[in-house]
Curated annotation (Swiss-Prot):
Gene: E1
Protein name: Replication protein E1
Statement: the UniProt record of this protein carries the keyword ATP-binding: yes
Described function: ATP-dependent DNA 3'-5' helicase required for initiation of viral DNA replication. It forms a complex with the viral E2 protein. The E1-E2 complex binds to the replication origin which contains binding sites for both proteins. During the initial step, a dimer of E1 interacts with a dimer of protein E2 leading to a complex that binds the viral origin of replication with high specificity. Then, a second dimer of E1 displaces the E2 dimer in an ATP-dependent manner to form the E1 tetramer.
Post-translational modification: Phosphorylated. Sumoylated.
Organism: Human papillomavirus 52
Amino acid sequence: MEDPEGTEGEREGCTGWFEVEAIIEKQTGDNISEDEDENAYDSGTDLIDFIDDSNINNEQAEHEAARALFNAQEGEDDLHAVSAVKRKFTSSPESAGQDGVEKHGSPRAKHICVNTECVLPKRKPCHVEDSGYGNSEVEAQQMADQVDGQNGDWQSNSSQSSGVGASNSDVSCTSIEDNEENSNRTLKSIQNIMCENSIKTTVLFKFKETYGVSFMELVRPFKSNRSSCTDWCIIGMGVTPSVAEGLKVLIQPYSIYAHLQCLTCDRGVLILLLIRFKCGKNRLTVSKLMSQLLNIPETHMVIEPPKLRSATCALYWYRTGLSNISEVYGTTPEWIEQQTVLQHSFDNSIFDFGEMVQWAYDHDITDDSDIAYKYAQLADVNSNAAAFLKSNSQAKIVKDCATMCRHYKRAERKHMNIGQWIQYRCDRIDDGGDWRPIVRFLRYQDIEFTAFLDAFKKFLKGIPKKNCLVLYGPANTGKSYFGMSLIRFLSGCVISYVNSKSHFWLQPLTDAKVGMIDDVTPICWTYIDDYMRNALDGNDISVDVKHRALVQIKCPPLILTTNTNAGTDPRWPYLHSRLVVFHFKNPFPFDENGNPIYEINNENWKSFFSRTWCKLDLIQEEDKENDGVDTGTFKCSAGKNTRSIRS
């Protein structure tokens, strides 16, 4: 074994020898060397620091401090890991009866010092669970004993290190408490949602248990509470018997049809109501109304619209309506009759595409969206429209219908002369117009009416060099108003020079009887002078059409409005003989209310053409048989045979 540190009396060995030698040298009285202090006392105090062991103590202190800091940091990491996994820490029994922060906070919040008393910080303000190796508490106890048995320097160092660890632990515990408060709020909201869902689940379960059918099989759920509907299915749980008996009378002022069933369960009377209101209502409005009538909370009701296209659901309402468990009043909804009554089953037919095209042709609808929207609105009165809504290829049907309708219209327009086309347009406009405002407006602009009729007759016939009318004048004189009203009546097309960079900007002229270019500028006049002289003459031109080869057509009559008189401008001498110019000199007049004095609309143009039909030399070719039926009516759908039921 090693010798113990220090001296313990006179023994054999080096230590005892040094002690004897010192005594002998002191007694012999020999000369003392200069290195020794002759004033030193003989008490032996000069040998206290002879062996320097401070280095050993410092090393031990550093190791212990590092271990303590490491343990504190591991404790913090464990706390964060546990809080991240659990999210919710239940309160311990010890803290259940405490006040203040310890009453409402987590178990670790009790280690946070909130008073002004001087309390020594603990080594571990937050409890750390055992790591699993079984020696965590032993190491903590040994570390505390070592700290108490060291010198002052080590105590100060350990207190500083423990203070740092304690402050870090306090901050971590405070942040954990904040996270717990946020998690508590989230948990409360989740509990509220769970509570509401559990009530709804209970209502649905009781309904299926009582009525023997799932409520969700009878309805089509609405996600939004703002969606409006006239027909609603309502479940009400916990209704008193007296209120359930009087509900049929209470609901009549608000509805036009009601189907009421009442059965008893362990939660009270459970009602099932199919109702059609007088006007559309959303779920929130229906919920408030029924809550007042039934005297139950809104959470005790389930409200959804019924399935309208399910034959099974319609049969359920029809059969239960005939039984003695239901009370029904009002007219049965059409969606129930169509799927249950025999006559409606006979009316159901397979979708006829030709009938849909005929409808679009008769109503002069060629736009895809208009065809889809307006034809779907006929589903209640038209069996073919109802069959169209049941189809899974509605988009393709609509696109094909619009394409076929445009083909028929284009061919029909192509085979009409200008007189037939004007008569065709007049037949689609109501009577009651007056031709006088048009004549008065021309006279107001100092335009001779006879000269205008002569030029207008040649314009409509497309005579070369007379195929283009130019309305020239300063701004705000009514040029565009006059020209646009005529184009609107004749169902012409308007082309704009802004699209001249495109190869297809003249394509609308291929499907029109009359065309118009509004507000022609000098740049546009230059373009017309360079590339469109033959178009102004009314001759055949070649037009680039999208997705097709070049199309050769006769250019329809053109109306141009401009602020530049190209008929006399020397910059375009080759246009002088191709233009018929009418000068609009005076500003367009308005009355005190801002309305035009000379109103020019479709009805007035119809009256104008009817009045000047002979002067314009518009000959209508009538092709009628002896019975007076017009053979020119186009039919694109096959005829129908009347079906009869044989007994």
